[in-house]
């Protein structure tokens, strides 16, 4: 009983440390229709302080990333662009946007380039989530954003004329374009990802409820079973390099890698690609709490692929602080939540191994903003 009380008290301390202060700035997103499926987003800093944030995977990103969610008759329309995992430190200046209090920027994009809207009719558009904020080009926290709900009438013929952002490649073997040191690194990453996912599946289904609550914001048996099932599916997919439900590239077949992108997934094709810095920047397996490595990056990308486990995850938030600020429904579908949970799960039974993210370590990490 004493242990349970202590764990609950520490978890309360963690949640308190992660709570948004009353004066925390937020980003307000106003969506308007420009012409048919072409949309304009106006992003405004509604706070009293200047903020610098990562605009990749957000508005102003030139890549075909998921900027908004589309719904037809309350059912989300499939996204056909890319979802990518980014560095959390050493970010380049061109990945960052700074907004003064009250300042705005605009971004125009065509939602028909990353979704099949050829059916036409009424489509509802909205977005929300968290954007990483930075200090000295390192992610140091997060800022929430939310948009209005925009309803548009789509002209089917005009939508069909919009070029798709990504032209599909021919499917190949599960691990494609791999040779030499990169093939070896990916092989190791897949083995490690499978081990991490299996351990995380056990922890999700029958491990500490306090720890599960920390990441997934609920201890319901149905959520624990769903999380465990996704981890088991990832472990199964990572266990074979000659067959499977995804195609995994050692290199970038579409040209969407840059100096800030570790890897990306094309969910509509269940295709995953590693970028150069996946090999040059990441260790195979980190010993640090909530740090990035090749294994959890691969695990993160597998969760995006709906063929591995449906529905595939989204990128509502990155990093421990933002991911643990999500609601239970968002955490269940947030790729980094799975990577972070797996990162802190011992690979050996708890009797012989302790988590690199012990509760005490996490309290210290939060206080240090790491």
Swiss-Prot record:
GO BP annotations, alphabetical order: proteolysis
Residues annotated as binding Zn(2+): 300, 304, 315
EC number: 3.4.24.39
GO cellular component, one term: extracellular region
Disulfide bonds: 178-250, 257-275
Compartments where located: Secreted
Pfam assignment, any one: Peptidase_M35
A GO MF label: metal ion binding
Range of residues in the leader sequence: 1-19
Major place of residence: secreted
Catalytically driven reaction(s): Preferential cleavage of bonds with hydrophobic residues in P1'. Also 3-Asn-|-Gln-4 and 8-Gly-|-Ser-9 bonds in insulin B chain
Active site as annotated: 301
Note on cofactor: Binds 1 zinc ion per subunit.
Pro-sequence residue ranges: 20-172
Keywords: Cleavage on pair of basic residues, Disulfide bond, Hydrolase, Metal-binding, Metalloprotease, Protease, Secreted, Signal, Virulence, Zinc, Zymogen
Chain's role: Secreted metalloproteinase that allows assimilation of proteinaceous substrates. Shows high activities on basic nuclear substrates such as histone and protamine. May be involved in virulence.
Similarity comment text for this entry: Belongs to the peptidase M35 family.
UniProt name for this protein: Neutral protease 2 homolog AFUB_070680
Species name: Aspergillus fumigatus (strain CBS 144.89 / FGSC A1163 / CEA10)
């Amino acid at each position: 009983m004493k242990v349970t009380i202590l764990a609950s008290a520490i978890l309360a301390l963690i949640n308190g440390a992660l709570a948004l202060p009353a004066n925390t700035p937020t980003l307000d997103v106003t969506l308007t229709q420009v012409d048919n499926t072409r949309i304009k987003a106006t992003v405004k800093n509604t706070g009293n302080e200047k903020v610098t944030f990562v605009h990749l995977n957000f508005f102003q990103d030139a890549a075909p990333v998921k900027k908004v969610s589309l719904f037809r008759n309350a059912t989300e329309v499939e996204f056909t662009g890319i979802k990518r995992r980014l560095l959390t430190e050493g970010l380049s200046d061109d990945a960052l946007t700074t907004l003064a209090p009250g300042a705005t920027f605009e971004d125009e994009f065509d939602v028909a380039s990353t979704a099949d809207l050829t059916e036409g009719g009424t489509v509802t558009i909205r977005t929300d989530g968290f954007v990483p904020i930075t200090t000295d080009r390192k992610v140091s926290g997060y800022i929430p954003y939310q948009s209005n709900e925009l309803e548009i009438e789509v002209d089917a013929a005009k939508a069909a004329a919009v070029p798709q952002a990504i032209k599909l490649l021919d499917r190949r073997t599960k691990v494609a374009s791999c040779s030499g040191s990169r093939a070896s690194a990916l092989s190791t990453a897949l083995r490690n990802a499978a081990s991490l996912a299996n351990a995380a599946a056990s922890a999700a289904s029958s491990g500490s409820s306090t720890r599960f609550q920390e990441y997934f914001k609920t201890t319901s048996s149905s959520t624990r079973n769903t999380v465990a099932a996704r981890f088991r599916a990832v472990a199964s997919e990572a266990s074979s390099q000659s067959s499977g439900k995804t195609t995994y590239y050692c290199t970038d077949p579409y040209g969407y890698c840059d100096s800030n992108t570790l890897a990306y997934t094309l969910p509509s094709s269940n295709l995953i690609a590693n970028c150069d810095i996946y090999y040059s920047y990441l260790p195979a397996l980190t010993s640090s709490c909530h740090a990035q490595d090749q294994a959890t990056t691969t695990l993160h990308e597998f969760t995006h692929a709906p063929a591995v486990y449906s529905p595939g995850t989204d990128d509502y938030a990155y990093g421990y602080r933002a991911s643990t600020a999500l609601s239970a429904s968002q955490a269940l579908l947030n790729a980094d939540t799975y990577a972070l949970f797996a990162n802190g799960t011992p690979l050996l039974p708890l009797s012989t191994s302790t988590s690199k993210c012990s509760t005490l370590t996490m309290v210290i990490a939060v206080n240090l903003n790491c």
